[in-house]
Design a protein with these regions (language model features):
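Extracellular carbohydrate-recognition regions
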Residues: 4, 8-59
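Surface-exposed coil/turn segments at beta-strand junctions on protein surfaces, enriched
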Residues: 5, 16, 117-119, 197-199
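Extracellular structured ligand-interaction cores
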Residues: 20-22, 66, 112-114, 118-125, ...
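Solvent-exposed strand-to-loop "edge" motifs in beta-rich extracellular domains
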Residues: 25-27, 74-76, 114-133, 140-148, ...
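Short carbohydrate-recognition loop motifs
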Residues: 62-86, 90-93, 98
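Extracellular/lumenal carbohydrate-interaction signature centered on repeated Trp-anchored short motifs
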Residues: 88, 92-124
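Short coil-to-beta strand junction motifs in C2/discoidin
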Residues: 141-161
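Extracellular carbohydrate recognition and processing domains
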Residues: 170-203
Length: 203
């Protein structure tokens, strides 16, 4: 017979996975499109290091007039025109799935890429257009500082769009900026092969 004075507590854990990843940019949080993470939090720290940021746009990733995400690369320099090696002279705007958690000792480890996914992806598609910077600068390290050097090659400035599928042994394990392009855990990669200027939206 059951003892009416005895109770048991059970903890039920439910795993939830995304079955469809669609990011249409229609809904935005305080800084980023819902479901995505940007480099905005990192850019917010740059003025604390003496970096001069432009007033427009307000950050590396903002909502454009047509509703798209506008991603901008900045020349991130101090008033005297250079930086310590901690900050590159050219800082690219980024938008990705995952989380941003600042790592002062290794800034590339601040981006923790990816979301748990337990389905076989059937396709990866996106819509974009791209305007290269003008003039074109390249970040060059010299004498322990990063400098923005003017480059004659206009084709050097191209956009980069890629999707990675990787296998890990636990949900706490992620890839970051130091290993996403070299890790053996990456089993599939889709990448834009033509990053040159596109004045109209491409799919």
């Amino acid at each position: 017979a059951e003892d009416p004075n005895t109770t048991k507590d059970f903890l039920i854990k439910i795993e939830r996975f995304a079955t469809t990843m669609v990011f249409d940019m229609k809904e935005w949080g305080e800084k980023d499109p819902v479901g995505l993470t940007s480099s905005n939090d990192a850019a917010a720290l740059l003025p604390l290091m003496g970096i001069i940021m432009p007033e427009e746009p307000a950050g590396p990733v903002v909502k454009a007039a047509d509703g798209a995400a506008r991603i901008t690369t900045f020349k991130t320099l101090t008033k005297d025109g250079h930086n310590p090696t901690l900050v590159p002279a050219i800082t690219a705007g980024t938008l990705f799935t995952g989380v941003f958690s600042i790592n002062i000792s290794s800034t590339l480890k601040s981006t923790k890429f990816g979301l748990p996914y337990n389905k076989k992806p059937s396709k990866f598609s996106f819509t974009y257009k791209y305007t290269p910077g003008s003039p074109v600068y390249q970040s060059v390290e010299k004498d322990g500082r990063n400098h923005a050097v003017l480059v004659d090659d206009k084709d050097l400035d191209q956009c980069s769009i890629a999707a990675y599928l990787f296998e890990v042994s636990s949900y706490d394990e992620t890839l970051d900026g130091t290993n996403v392009n070299t890790s053996s855990k990456v089993i599939l990669k889709a990448e834009l092969t033509d990053g040159t200027a596109k004045s109209d939206y491409q799919e």
